[in-house]
Amino acid sequence: MRFYHRDELIDVIRSADLYVHPAEFEIEAIACLEAISCGRTPLIADAPRSATRFFALTDRNLFRANDPRDLAEKMDWWLEHPDEREACAQRYAGYARQFDFDRCMDEMERMLTDTTGAKRHVP
């Protein structure tokens, strides 16, 4: 096991057919966001203490936490249906755009200026 630089990590993610997110505890879901931004269809554990489960667009993107059989069945389905997997990846790519850093910062600035009544700085 090793750490990857960002460019290396993107290459690793893009080389995968699916992205599996088995975390039982997570708040930010950054790894999942990176994977879907790279065009990977995610399989996400439905762990009750993981916010990432809320990124599942369909039931096929969720598997029962700590249930390797359910995970294997979901993986097999996605691997046996490449057209559906690609369509799902495209939906996720569009979905991930709302979490783009620059877009989020623009929204945060808009929220703060609306709340304070200040004028928005437009470069």
State each model region's role:
Residues Y4, D11-A16:
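Short alpha-helical donor nucleotide-sugar binding micro-motif in glycosyltransferases
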Residues I10, E28, L33-S37, A51-R53:
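Short alpha-helical segment that forms part of, or immediately flanks, the ligand-binding pocket
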Residues D17, G39:
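A short alpha->beta transition loop at the rim of the catalytic pocket in nucleotide-sugar-dependent
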Residues E24:
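Aromatic "clamp/platform" in nucleotide-sugar-dependent glycosyltransferases that forms part
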Residues T41-D46:
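Short hydrophobic beta-strand element within catalytic cores of glycosyltransferases
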Residues L57-P68, W77-P82:
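Conserved acidic donor-binding segment of nucleotide-sugar-dependent glycosyltransferases
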Residues E80-T113:
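A charged, aromatic-enriched C-terminal amphipathic alpha-helix characteristic of glycosyltransferases
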